[in-house]
Amino acid sequence: MNSIASRPLLSGEDLDTAIDQARTELAGLLRGSEDIVGTGGQEAVAEARTLLAALLDRRVTEAAARMDERDGRAVAAARADRNEAIAVTGALLYWLSADEAAWPEVALTFGRLSYDRYTDPWPGAESPDPDDLDAACDLLLRGARYDDADERTTLYLFLALRDRQHLLACPNDAKALMTWGRRLLMFPDAGGLGRSSLHDMLEFEPFLVTAQ
């Protein structure tokens, strides 16, 4: 699965074509799954899932950046891509062992996509599903490494933990929220929240004050 990171970034029609090809490849492998014997065949399926999930994730990211919320078809397409990416990533995560090198990155992707679905900002969104929030918090916490986490991952973790703490106060979540909030403060823009605003949040949120 290391080869995925070395692939060039695609966009537009090239990305659409790559997704269609990845879907076809994965479907072919799954149709022949009864004939797949041994680790090599299973790894081929995992590789295909990894590629398809990465491509779908990229298309969702591109769509979100330019989304016209009045375009119902574009919104529906982005949601469908995100749901497919979650399903494919979930299947991959189920297959991987937690001690495999690829597991943390897959867990982070699944957690991030789950939080995006939980906080869906587009018109016609379904009610937020707490299961998505739990998946986001739990998998981001398991997949992230404090000293190595980038700004994006740290922001997702902070926001997901904050939202879950608002729903159901939990001492462990409050402590984790403080920890990752401090990590987010290490970045110049604090993930877009602004260091001053984040600092005030960490100082004055009632459930965080009690965790300090």
Regions found by a protein language model. Give the residues of each.
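The feature captures the hydrophobic core positions of alpha-helical coiled-coils
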Residues: 15, 19-22, 29, 55-56, ...
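Short, charged, amphipathic alpha-helical segments
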Residues: 39-49, 75-83, 130, 134, ...
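Flexible helix-coil transition and linker loops at the boundaries of alpha-helical arrays
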Residues: 32-45, 89-105, 142-150, 186-194
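Alpha-helical repeat scaffolds
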Residues: 82-94, 126-142, 170-187
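N-terminal leader/linker segments that initiate helical-solenoid repeat arrays
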Residues: 2-25
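Amphipathic alpha-helical repeat scaffolds of TPR domains
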Residues: 1-7, 27, 43-73, 99-123, ...
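Extended repeat-based scaffolds of very large eukaryotic assembly and lipid-transport proteins
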Residues: 19-22, 30-33, 37, 63-67
